[in-house]
Structure formats: structure tokens, C-alpha cells
Amino acid sequence: MMDLDKIIASLRDGKHIPEETVFRLCLNSQELLMNEGNVTQVDTPVTICGDIHGQLHDLLTLFEKSGGVEKTRYIFLGDFVDRGFYSLESFLLLLCYKLRYPDRITLIRGNHETRQITKVYGFYDEVVRKYGNSNVWRYCCEVFDYLSLGAIINNSIFCVHGGLSPDMTTVDEIRTIDRKQEVPHEGAMCDLLWSDPEDVDTWSLSPRGAGFLFGKREVDQFLEKNNVELIARAHQLVMEGYKEMFDGGLVTVWSAPNYCYRCGNVAAVLKIDDDLNREYTIFEAVQAQNEVGNAIIPTKKSQMDYFL
């Protein structure tokens, strides 16, 4: 039996976790996540969090600002890993909290929770640097395949990492996807993780090379068809931490302050109360990113500028 509280304390301090412990954490997480649907039902009150991207110290600040997991319900909208230097610790910490408080944490898959993307944007290299092999990366990727694709809060707010898909316009259709796989390069599962809202008249190809751009018309149709009042998503850097669009029918939440340790943005989380009122909490980056755990060592592989 694993001592989750002890592992959580070690992860919060940035300490090394033995490979065997990571294997057991990931295996137990798969067993828990496989019993959740593609779209998880979540009650209020709940706090919605956007991209984390391996910024462990800022994730700890998020919990300080919004409340401990033992007393606060959270939805994380994906992109736990890549770009930041503590992707592994950030993801494992969230898995530990999920195992310790399964009804308090909902984890949604982002476009970075894939084998292909993590090989390019830092997570793979981080694991090899810390363990000398890629086993832990492989264990985590197997967990990625079991993460939910979305969540519904009180049957009124649809949460997703990226956005909408022209191939599936109802939540019930999304529930039918076979999610336990690497994210395809096209199709509804891909679109949910890759698409972006934009001031466009109709579905348009995304410059990202995956997913679509969608506008107010598509959002209004989705809200009406599914009898929900808000789409909450992440996936795009927002300098102010959050951005509402389309008469408040969609919001982007971004939770990685000073993204990539250089963008200068603030971060936000969105609390939804029992009456579905919205309350945004803004927070700034931790100044000394190497105060906890080992000093930061950048990955050797050059990383493309922000576009994923």
C-alpha cells in the first residue's frame, strides 16, 4: 500500500520519486480513470484550472490561492506537461491527489498529453535526464490514454481542453468516442483537444495544423443543442489569465503564469459556485523558480515557440 501523503509531500518539495513508485502510481491511476466516462459529471462548487505546463511552483501557488484539495473541488483542463521544467512532478502530484481524493480532482486530457508531442516539447527529455531512461515517460503516456475528454458541471457548463468539433455537436456523441488511444491526427477526439475559438463566420482550418477554428455561431448552436450555458476551455495563452468571448458563452482559462518563464502573463482560475456564478482568481508567477528541489536545467533540445 502506497503512502500517498508521503509521496505528495515529496513531490511538493521537488524530490526524486523512485521509478517503481511511479510505475505503481500510474498503474493505480489507470485503474481509477478507466471507470470514468469520456465526459465526467462534476458538482458545484468547483474551481476550473487551465494549462499548467510543468510549472510546479506555480501549481503550488494555485492551490494556496484556491484551497487545498481536501476541501476544494478542482477540474484541470489538461496540458499538465511540457515546456516547464517540472512536468513530471506536476503530473504525478495531480495523479496523487486524484488517487487520494478521487471525487475532488477531475483531470482532462490536453493536446500535450500524447507521446508525439511530449517527445518534442520537453517531457520526454526531462524524464530521461532525471532517470537515465524513458520508462517513466512510457508509464505516464499510458495514463494519458485514460484521461477524460471533457466534463459537465451541474449539467450546465461544458469543460474541454481545446474546443468544438464539426464531427460531433452533442455531449452524448462525445461520450461514444474510444478515447483509450494516442490522440489521432484528425477527427472529433483530435478537435476537442486542438480547436480554438476565433472571430470567424464558420468552421475554418486551424493554423496549428490540427483541429478547427470556430466562432460565435458554432458556440451558440452547441450551447442551445446541449442545453448548457458556458464552454470552459484552456489551450491558448491569455495574458490576463482568462478571456470571455461570444457574449460570455465561452471562456479561456490559463493557469501558467509567466509562461515558459518569459511571457510575463498572469494566470487565473475560475470558481463556479452553486448558483453557477463565476469568480476569477488572478495570480502571478513564483519569482525564484529554483527555490524548490534541484536547480533548473533546461532541456538540450531546442523547442519551437508557442503554437501548441
Curated annotation (Swiss-Prot):
What SUPFAM superfamilies is this protein classified in? Metallo-dependent phosphatases
**What molecular function terms (GO) are annotated for this protein?**
metal ion binding; protein serine/threonine phosphatase activity
Q: Name one Pfam family in it.
A: Metallophos
Compartments where located: Cytoplasm; Nucleus
Q: What is its EC number?
A: 3.1.3.16
Alphabetized InterPro entries for the sequence? Calcineurin-like_PHP_ApaH, Metallo-depent_PP-like, PPA2-like, Ser/Thr-sp_prot-phosphatase
Bound how, and how many: what does the cofactor note say? Binds 2 manganese ions per subunit.
Alphabetized PANTHER family for the sequence? SERINE/THREONINE-PROTEIN PHOSPHATASE PP2A-RELATED
State any further remark: Present with 2840 molecules/cell in log phase SD medium.
**What is its quaternary makeup?**
Catalytic subunit of the histone H2A phosphatase complex (HTP-C) containing PPH3, PSY2 and PSY4. Inactivated in a complex with phosphatase methylesterase PPE1 (PP2Ai). Interacts with phosphatase 2A activator RRD1, which can reactivate PP2Ai by dissociating the catalytic subunit from the complex. Interacts with SPT5 and TAP42.
Please report the name of this protein according to its UniProt entry.
Serine/threonine-protein phosphatase 4 catalytic subunit
The organism named in the record is Saccharomyces cerevisiae (strain ATCC 204508 / S288c) (Baker's yeast)
Question: Which gene produces this protein?
Answer: PPH3
